[in-house]
């Protein structure tokens, strides 16, 4: 859209997601901002970022997107703890980076979409290096939770982990099946291979 401008900033060295966000500090300034991790592809009627932005307007607090995952997979995610709620929006009470299944506070994992107030930057600047000798976004979120509300949003849509080879293949198949030109032919091929 005409009213949107994109700026790309390279992270000079792989020092974690928190470090990557800090590279954009001068561009972010005093604004709220979104973080989108490209390896999390989410297929939904209404874009997840749009869903989250609508929530942000209502609550004016930082939001992380979450999805129910199998506890055995908690070692791959930031796992959250929240106030009890029946809705898709929950107030965070804790977050742990890649815990063992036994130590996971819930079955909700954080997945690749965030909207933050610029205050997250001050937490990122002061937390130092965490797990993997990286600046961990989850550590900054944990500090933020102690001073202001942060919410978890269980989005509507199907997520594909394109950082995983099988997840990448599944995403390509799902999107190809929806394609008007190739979908039917691909479905016939897959059925033939399944027999």
What are these regions (language model features)?
Residues 34, 54-57, 86-188:
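Catalytic-core segments of class I nucleotidyltransferases/pyrophosphorylases
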């Amino acid at each position: 859209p005409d009213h949107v401008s994109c700026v790309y900033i390279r992270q000079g060295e792989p020092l974690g997601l928190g470090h990557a966000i800090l590279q954009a500090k001068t561009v972010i300034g005093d604004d709220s901002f979104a973080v989108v991790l490209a390896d999390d592809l989410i297929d939904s009627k209404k874009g997840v970022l749009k869903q989250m932005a609508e929530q942000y307007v209502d609550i004016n607090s930082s939001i992380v997107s979450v999805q129910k995952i199998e506890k055995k997979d908690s070692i791959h995610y930031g796992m959250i703890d929240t106030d009890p709620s029946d809705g898709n929006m929950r107030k965070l009470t804790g977050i742990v980076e890649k815990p063992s299944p036994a130590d996971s506070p819930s079955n909700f994992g954080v997945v690749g979409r965030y909207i933050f107030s610029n205050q997250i930057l001050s937490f990122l600047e002061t937390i130092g290096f965490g797990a993997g000798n990286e600046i961990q976004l989850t550590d900054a979120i944990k500090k933020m939770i102690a001073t202001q509300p942060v919410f978890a949003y269980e989005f509507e849509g199907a997520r594909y982990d394109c950082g995983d080879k099988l997840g990448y293949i599944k995403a390509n198949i799902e999107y190809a099946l929806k394609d008007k030109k190739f979908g039917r032919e691909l479905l016939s091929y897959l059925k033939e291979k399944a027999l």
